[in-house]
């Protein structure tokens, strides 16, 4: 290991549907890393894995700034472990579990966390969609089992839209989640730490008028949505949501940091999903919450590296 600067492998790009987001995040992370403290080597897993393996012995720690398949799903985490390279965030298990929306729901329920009513549509055994609509009511949200950034997601308000939405989900995965649409305030709660989890200020998300929900474009287009931090919630709801973010992190075996999306409906909070590698672009939520907590972007990266090296 280096006796002066830490050698950091910065991984961004990859081959998932979220490649462009990853590249933007990676560029901002590279610019924010303190070059007085770190020697930063950049790798795109889409074509640099052989070089990464060859460089493994000189790498002190990796920053995984990848999203979606082969980034957040435990694949790259397993490779880094086989190479003996520490990395920030969740391990193989936590990454794989959080990436799977259906399994995540089961673990949330097991942990006593509230989720919206939902059903699973399996392409091998297609459900009767009229029965689905009767059981859940409309509107519903249809999501592929594994994709992130709302890729493949549809909101269905009429029965005649349901079949097409499920077919869209099946383009990405054999199974998709059909979830009751909950009207309310969309919030997200980040946590930071290993043994001691620091709950960051909650962010309230208000998609712009052109966006029905916080979808891919709303997330990554500057000015497409408003984010209010801290969220405009009562102290009681705030404390409950922050505790839910901690519990969701633990229920999915996450590590280091995560961000859990939730809906506040009246006095109720419903867990949507947990992100194990939150975005790191100018419009990203986790860095915004950290900044409100007094943690600059550069200091956040320092902290993630420290947490990666704790084990």
Swiss-Prot record:
Localization of this protein: Cytoplasm
Residue positions binding Mg(2+) 2: 273, 275
A biological process term (GO) from this entry: peptidoglycan biosynthetic process
UniProt key word Chaperone: no
Catalytic activity: 2 D-alanine + ATP = D-alanyl-D-alanine + ADP + phosphate + H(+)
Positions annotated to bind ATP: 133-188
Example GO molecular function: metal ion binding
UniProt keyword list: ATP-binding, Cell shape, Cell wall biogenesis/degradation, Cytoplasm, Ligase, Magnesium, Manganese, Metal-binding, Nucleotide-binding, Peptidoglycan synthesis
PANTHER family, per database record: D-ALANINE--D-ALANINE LIGASE, D-ALANINE--D-ALANINE LIGASE B
The protein's name in its UniProt record: D-alanine--D-alanine ligase
